[in-house]
């Protein structure tokens, strides 16, 4: 089976770089892009067609849910996993309504994060 193609969108430089390093080493995953700007991430998602986008919605620009909406509209075959440091029940509900596959906290360990990403890919395999 081909590795799951992953795009990371997170405006926290240190966190984004750490995620890229952690997930680049994970078997079964290929990090195809990594950016802090959601607009750049959206363009990358349209161009690269990742299986999964890992998206931080609690952004300094306040545009996290807008980024999710745009991804859902423009990349309907890409699943989005929201990964955040700041859990928010209302945002979680909105994220799922918009189309997020899952909503998880950044303190998750790497093996569990990889499982969440792989679980987000599975529905596509059935199409």
Predicted feature descriptions by range:
Residues 2-15, 19-23:
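Conserved acidic segment of CheY-like receiver
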Residues 36-52:
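Acidic, metal-coordinating helix/loop segments flanking the phosphotransfer/catalytic sites
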Residues 38, 54-68:
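Conserved phosphotransfer microenvironments
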Residues 65-77:
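Short amphipathic alpha-helix used as the core "switch/output" element in two-component signaling
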Residues 86-87:
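Short, conserved "switch-loop" micro-motifs in signal-transduction and mechanochemical regulators
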Residues 90, 108-118, 125:
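C-terminal output helix
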């Amino acid at each position: 089976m081909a590795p799951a193609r992953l795009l990371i969108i997170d405006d926290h430089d240190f966190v984004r770089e750490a995620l890229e390093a952690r997930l680049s080493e994970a078997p079964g995953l290929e990090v195809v892009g990594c950016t802090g700007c959601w607009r750049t991430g959206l363009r990358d998602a349209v161009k690269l067609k990742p299986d999964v986008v890992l998206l931080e919605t609690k952004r300094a620009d306040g545009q996290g849910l807008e980024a999710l909406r745009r991804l859902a509209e423009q990349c309907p075959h890409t699943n989005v996993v929201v990964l955040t440091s700041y859990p928010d029940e209302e945002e979680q509900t909105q994220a799922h309504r918009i189309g997020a596959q899952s909503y998880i906290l950044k303190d998750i360990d790497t093996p569990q994060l990889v499982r969440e990403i792989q679980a987000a890919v599975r529905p596509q395999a059935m199409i």
